[in-house]
Each structure stands twice: as C-alpha cells, then as structure tokens.
Regions:
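Two-component/phosphorelay signaling modules centered on CheY-like receiver
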Residues: 10-28
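Acidic, metal-coordinating helix/loop segments flanking the phosphotransfer/catalytic sites
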Residues: 29-47
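Acidic catalytic/metal-coordinating carboxylates
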Residues: 31-32, 58-61
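Short amphipathic alpha-helix used as the core "switch/output" element in two-component signaling
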Residues: 38, 60-72
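Active-site residues of response regulator receiver
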Residues: 51, 79
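Receiver (REC) domain active-site loop signature in two-component systems and cognate sites
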Residues: 54
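Alpha4 helix (beta4-alpha4-beta5 surface) of REC/receiver domains from two-component response regulators
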Residues: 61, 82-97
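C-terminal output helix
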Residues: 85, 103-113
Length: 119
C-alpha cells in the first residue's frame, strides 16, 4: 500500500517521508496539491497525508478535488495553523484525522494503521 505526502515545506515533507518509510510503508512525496493531482501516483495511493495551508491549492481544495474526481482513499490532514472551522470542514469532507504541527508521532502511527486497515 502506498502513502502520499503533500506538503510545501521541504523539511516537514522529508521528515515525514523518513518516518513513514521507517514504518515499512511505500511513500511518494509532493511539494504541492497540483503536483500530486497531476501525478500517476494518485491511482496507487491508499492514504494521503496533506498539509492544509499551502500556496495554490490548499489541502482542503485538494480534498474537494479528489472527492469530485472519485478518489476515495483515506486522508490525514495536518496543519501548523489549527482552526476549529477548518478542522470541522476537513472532517466533514472525509478526512479521518486532523493533526496540528508539531504532532505526536504515536498519533500519526495510529491514524496510518486505521487508514491502511480500511483501504
């Protein structure tokens, strides 16, 4: 099963990639929502970890586009700018988790396990 990570922050994206790889998962990373949407990886993704606040399309915009195009994999939303309205919108649109940066890696592991079991 493949996990995609979308985050415009190189340091965060690379750290998450190393962490998820250390758990034994296949990982692809993208610096923007647009890059992910235009990739062939989209059809092989089982779980998406996406930042919510990015230039161009936000993580919420990405989630909306994925739903509109029939992609139904599990989404874990992360943000450095936690906001209750944004959390509610992400969860109502189908995200299985909303994590504020910095987040506890044990929580991420739990959400990844949940996402991949449901995939």
């Amino acid at each position: 099963m493949s996990i995609a990570i979308v985050d415009d922050d190189d340091v965060v994206r690379e750290a998450m990639e190393c962490f998820v790889l250390s758990l034994g998962h296949s990982v692809s990373t993208f610096g923007s929502a647009e890059e992910f949407l235009n990739s062939e990886q989209i059809s092989r993704t089982s779980c998406l970890i996406t930042d919510l606040h990015m230039p161009g399309l936000s993580g919420l915009d990405l989630q909306d586009r994925l739903i509109a195009t029939g992609h139904r994999f599990r989404i874990i939303s992360i943000t450095g700018y936690p906001d209750e309205d944004v959390r509610v919108r992400a969860m109502k649109a189908g995200a299985i988790a909303f994590l504020s940066k910095p987040f506890n890696t044990d929580r991420l592991i739990g959400y990844l396990d949940k996402a991949l079991k449901a995939a």
